[in-house]
Amino acid sequence: MSAFARRNPPGIIWIEATIVAEIHIKHLGGFMIKLKKLSAIALAAVMAASALTGCGSKKNKSTVTTTPTDLSDEQTTTVDTSKETSSDAKDDSNSEKSFGLTQKTADGTILQCFSWSFNTIKDSLEDIALAGYSTIQTSPVNACYNGGDAGIDLNGSGKWYYHYQPTDWTIGNYQLGTKEEFKSMCEEADKYGIKVIVDVVPNHTTKSTEALGEGLLNAVGGIDNLYHKKGKDEVSNYKDRGECTHQAVGGLFDVNTENIAFQNYFINYMNECIACGADGFRFDTAKHIGLPDDPVEDSSMPNTFWTNVLSKLDNKDNLFIYGEVLQDGGDRIADYIDTLGAATASSYGYTIRGALQTGNLDVRNLTNYGIGNAKPNIVTWVESHDNYTGDDATYSKITNEDIVLGWTVLAAQKTGTPLFFSRPYNASSDLIWGTFNKIGMSGDYLYKNSAITAANRFRNAMAGEEQNIFNPSDSTSVIFIERGKKGLAIVNASIKPYEFNVETNLADGEYKDRVSGNTYTVKDGKISGTIENKSTIILYNDGYLEFAPAAIVKVDDSVTGSYNTDSIEVKLHVENATEGEYSVDGASPVAYKDNDTITIGAGKNSQETTTLKLTAVNEAGNKTAMTYIFRKQATLTGSIEVTFVKPDSWGDKVYAYVYDETTKAPTVIENAAWPGVEMEHVEGNKYKYTFEKNWEGYEPLIIFNDSNNQSNAAMEPGENVINGKEYTCN
């Protein structure tokens, strides 16, 4: 789920900070909903400024509270991190290949395979295991809204958030793959000891009710029984538990989850997922489904969803289950943790990102998980897909370097189960959807970066060890995270190197940094050395497993996923392998060397795709694979005309804003300043726009609006321009 807002005109980026725990208007596939922006003084107002760097001194071993005022000595804390989550054990030592992964999801790390297809995940499992992830999380596997002409753009012709617009609770959809492919993926994951979490969405459906499945409607007794009485009315007060659990979020209709017939239908869906190989679930919008003592709409229908659903899941004791509970003061997070077993710690995500942006890793902030006295059974993150795609716009504020630092802080701790959001392939602060913008492809290679991998493997080796976290006396830009007497992770968020000389629980001896390969010595209970600016150190010997570097296959970074010529030349790369292989549209593989160039896509019609699959094997026989999806975009020449059908709620003046801000344009090219050119009224709610500007050689996008409402969501690109197409807000 994500936040909605009007798209910023190209070239303008919001830089205000926010300290609210949740933006309530959610981007769930509806069109534009106006946000009341809650601006705040930057997070520097919440945290102290980064302290000086220099040589460390003796570490104070005493435990401190989470909000002390005394900054005179080193801050250290030992946190009680006892967990009560489900066992969900899957031992990779019994798998065909062992990668040192944890038996329990809670003890390891989770890779969120954001919009990856089932086949892509299956092809990537060996890379995922080598990178140290014990669990993967899929996007929703349910039948979903088929919009954007069934396109597979993350945003454009098709949208990622259609995953979160269920039309039925059956396995398989046009974006991610079939039920058979899902089952095959789960079976392959078993071979590596990797657990599979499925993102499930019981709270709401698409607002396009004509798309709902007949099986669903028959099961619940017709559409009138599917929704709450006010299920189509938007929530206005998120602290009102009646509104929060009975009304629509982001324009999507709120399911009557108290309906026993619906519960049974949904239980069957979840058990089908389990039968296919699912090892756990993330409940999307969990706080919008009532707890037993929340207000009820009908006294004959008590809040039994959680009790009934969770008690009737097959293999329940071995499942890892958590709920998305975005915190706002009325979220009841402690009760959701008690009910489901674990929940997201969204407020802690804000804390982590604030620390990264200010360079202040104050232990007192980073050991305050924002959950009060609740059990620390939390899923933590540097960013979620909501933070990335929504109003937080972390894609433009949090760099890959920041993510490495933040991820190490999360993965090194015992508290929480870290979830790594896999950004779109080759994404950047200028390209939120990356250079390919395709559903189905794997994400940016950062997820298997060497420092990320080192942090994951450290966490796996430290399972069960208690944590001791402290800052040296002269800097809160550096944080030390000890795990028992076994390992130590150090993170420096400063722009300067830091020399340290501190006491440690590690036994005397030499320890190799699993990131750089440098060696550090512990002598007489103290460790000294230098950590470079904006970097991490991972030290441990016991439990370390050596693996050959994974092969890397990729296209050149200059290559993008669309082309407007007859064909496209693609330069190929391969590392940590003598050669790679490529296959085009499923043809027989052909060997290639690093820097070879091939030509693909010839003869394709506009909007048709070409699939390029690259594979290679490293020296240890570990296979890596990457699939790219290219789309031919016809050159726009001559007269171009499009039509748009506006929603009833819009004003009578409708505009077309056409622009190109890709790297092919030196500056933003547009048909007019925002809101664009007024469209010509045809009839009813239909309007047309005839292009006057010559867009040959460019890849324009279009946004329809009435100057208050618009056809796309916050900070997301418009749709591709296709001559003769009729557009809608769906």
Language model features with spans:
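Short, Lys/Arg-enriched N-terminal segments with co-localized hydrophobic residues
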Residues: 3, 11-31
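Sec-dependent signal peptide cleavage junction
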Residues: 51-69
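Active-site-proximal helices and loops of the catalytic beta/alpha 8
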Residues: 89-107, 123-129, 140, 145-164, ...
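Aromatic- and acidic-residue-enriched carbohydrate-binding clefts of CAZyme catalytic domains
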Residues: 91-94, 104-108, 144-187, 221-254
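Short proline/glycine-enriched turn/loop motifs at strand-loop junctions of beta-rich domains
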Residues: 414, 495, 504-509, 573-579, ...
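Exposed beta-strand face motif in extracellular beta-rich ectodomains
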Residues: 537, 608-612, 697-702
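Low-complexity, disordered linker/stalk regions enriched in Pro/Thr/Ser/Gly
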Residues: 546-636
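Aromatic-rich carbohydrate-binding modules that target alpha-glucans
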Residues: 589-595, 647-696, 707-717
